A protein has these predicted regions:
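N-terminal helix-loop segment corresponding to the beta1-alpha1 unit
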Residues: 1-128
């Protein structure tokens, strides 16, 4: 669950990163930002990364994911569908910051250049 106190309380962040940006998103969430991370249907592939609690890899026992996922909210979305792409666009509109990695999940469904023109205050961080 997102933290409600901290230096970044009230800042809304959309996390579209992959493993290259997941730690930065965790740090921002730990500082109080409301970080939302969409996942593909079936869950984020990072949920399968070991080690796993009691050696069982079922998508909910990844110790790696448990650490990096703390303080954030997750939801499933399919950005290849019109409905999923629209969900992501609405999230961008409500965000103060969008974290991306070139080619990461959901970035193809969102035109961040247009979003920046419509929301000049939007901060886009692209991690390589």
């Amino acid at each position: 669950m997102a933290t409600t106190e901290g230096a970044l309380a009230g800042v809304h962040i959309l996390d579209l990163t992959d493993e290259r940006g997941i730690y930065g998103a965790k740090l921002l969430a730990d500082l109080g930002a409301d970080v939302v991370r969409p996942e593909p249907p079936g869950g984020d592939p990072l949920r399968q990364r070991g080690p796993h609690r009691q050696g069982v890899a079922d998508g909910s026992t990844s110790l790696w994911h448990a650490f990096f996922a703390s303080s954030r909210r997750f939801f499933a979305v399919d950005p290849t569908t019109p409905e999923g792409a629209e969900q992501l666009r609405r999230l961008v509109e409500r965000s103060d910051i969008v974290l991306t990695c070139d080619g990461s999940f959901g970035t193809a469904a969102v035109d961040l250049d247009t979003a920046r023109k419509q929301q000049p205050e939007l901060v886009v961080v692209d991690t390589s």
